[in-house]
Design a protein with these regions (language model features):
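A cross-kingdom feature marking solvent-exposed beta-strand/loop segments within repeated
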Residues: 36-55, 77-95, 102, 113-114, ...
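Vicinal oxygen chelate
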Residues: 5-15, 55-76, 81-110, 132-138, ...
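Basic/polar N-terminal segments that are highly enriched at the extreme N-terminus
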Residues: 1-3, 309
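Loop-centered beta-sheet repeat module
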Residues: 145-173
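Internal, hydrophobic cores of structured domains that mediate oligomerization or house catalytic pockets
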Residues: 136-148
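Core segments of cupin and vicinal oxygen chelate
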Residues: 13-67, 128, 168-222, 261, ...
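Short hydrophobic beta-strand motif reused across regulatory alpha/beta modules
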Residues: 145-148, 225, 301-304
Length: 309
C-alpha cells in the first residue's frame, strides 16, 4: 500500500520570477523561505524534460502559519512558454490553489486595490463543511487562486495557510478511486457535491457552469486535495505540447520517507512514470530524492522524500 503523506507543495512555472516572488511573498504572505536553487543545469531532470541541458532556478516558500507551500520555477533551457494563453477554471490538471483567510468579504474589500480579483465574493453551504465563502483572483501570470473562509478557519492573522490544491479531472469517480487507492488520500473530508454549480461562471469561460467536487485528505497528514469535474463547459485537456517548466501550474508534490518502496509500489500498480527516482543535486536538500508519475488525466504528480523526524 502507499506509504506516504498528502500534499507538501505545488510547483508553478513562471516567466517573471521577481514579479511572482513579490506577489506571493509580499501580497499573499509567503514570507517563510524554505529553500532556493541557483540558475544552473539540473541534471537530475534531464529525463523529465527529455533533453539536456535543463537550466532553471527556483525558490520555495510558505506562509508563517504553515500549510501547503509553493515552489516557483524559472526555466531557461529548454525555452519555456505559457501552458495556455488563457487559464480557466476547469482546465484539466492542477488548476488552482486554495488559501484560507479570516473573512472573504473583508479580505476582498481591503485587498482589491492590490489583487486582481476575477470574481465577486460568493457563498454556499456544503453539508460536511457548513458555510463556505470564496472569491477568486489571478496572480500576475494569470494562475487562479481561491480565497476561502468558513467556521473551520480561526486565528488573528490575515492568512490561514494554503489549505488545499484543486485538481480538475475528466471523470470524477475514476480520479477519486485513483487518489484513494494509489496515493493514500483515504479520508473523505467533503463528499461529492454540486454546490459550486452556477457560482463560477466568471472564471470558467461559460455560463450556467456545472461542476461536481469533493475533498480528500491523507489521514496520516499533509495537505488536502480537491478533485473537481466541470461538466459544462467541459474542462480542456492538458496541451500535448506542454513540458515541465512551462509557465503555469506544473505539479502537485506528495511526500514520504522511502523512495525505493514507493517506486516499487507504483511499478506494481502500473502507474506511468515521468521520472524514475533521482537524488536532488543540491546540499540545501540534504540528498532528498524524488520521482514523478502521472494521474489518470496525465497531470504530473511528484513524490519526494523528507528526513525522518
Amino acid at each position: 500500500m502507499y506509504d506516504g503523506f498528502g500534499v507538501d507543495h505545488i510547483g508553478i512555472g513562471v516567466d517573471n520570477m521577481e514579479r511572482m516572488k513579490t506577489f506571493y511573498q509580499e501580497v499573499l504572505g509567503f514570507g517563510q523561505l524554505i529553500a532556493s536553487m541557483p540558475r544552473k543545469d539540473h541534471t537530475v531532470i534531464h529525463e523529465l524534460q527529455r533533453t539536456a541541458p535543463t537550466i532553471h532556478d527556483h525558490i520555495h516558500f510558505n506562509q508563517e502559519v504553515g500549510g501547503i507551500s509553493i515552489a516557483l520555477f524559472r526555466s531557461y533551457e529548454p525555452v519555456p512558454r505559457p501552458i495556455r494563453e488563457d487559464f480557466r477554471y476547469g482546465d484539466i490538471g492542477l488548476s488552482k490553489a486554495t488559501i484560507a483567510v479570516n473573512d472573504v468579504e473583508r479580505f476582498y474589500t481591503e485587498m482589491k486595490g492590490g489583487i486582481n480579483f476575477c470574481s465577486q465574493p460568493k457563498h454556499t453551504t456544503i453539508s460536511e463543511w457548513g458555510d463556505y465563502h470564496f472569491v477568486y483572483c489571478r496572480d500576475p501570470e494569470n494562475n487562479l487562486v481561491e480565497f476561502v473562509s468558513d467556521a473551520n478557519i480561526k486565528g488573528k492573522s490575515k492568512f490561514g495557510g494554503m489549505r488545499s490544491v484543486g485538481m480538475s479531472v475528466t471523470d470524477l469517480p475514476r480520479s477519486i478511486s485513483f487518489y484513494q487507492k494509489y496515493l493514500g488520500f483515504d479520508k473523505v473530508v467533503v463528499k461529492t457535491h454540486e454546490k459550486f454549480s452556477g457560482l463560477v461562471d466568471e472564471i470558467s469561460g461559460g455560463t450556467n457552469t456545472q461542476v461536481r467536487s469533493c475533498v480528500l485528505v491523507n489521514s496520516k497528514g499533509g495537505g488536502m486535495i480537491e478533485l473537481f469535474e466541470v461538466m459544462n463547459p467541459r474542462g480542456r485537456s492538458i496541451p500535448f505540447s506542454a513540458i515541465w517548466g512551462d509557465f503555469g501550474y506544473l505539479q502537485t508534490c506528495l511526500y514520504g520517507y522511502d523512495i525505493k518502496y514507493t517506486e516499487e509500489y507504483f511499478k506494481e500498480k502500473n502507474l506511468e512514470f515521468l521520472l524514475t527516482p533521482k537524488v536532488i543535486d543540491d546540499p540545501v536538500y540534504g540528498g532528498m530524492s524524488f520521482l514523478y508519475v502521472r494521474d489518470p488525466d496525465g497531470a504530473p504528480i511528484e513524490f519526494m522524500t523528507i528526513p525522518k523526524p
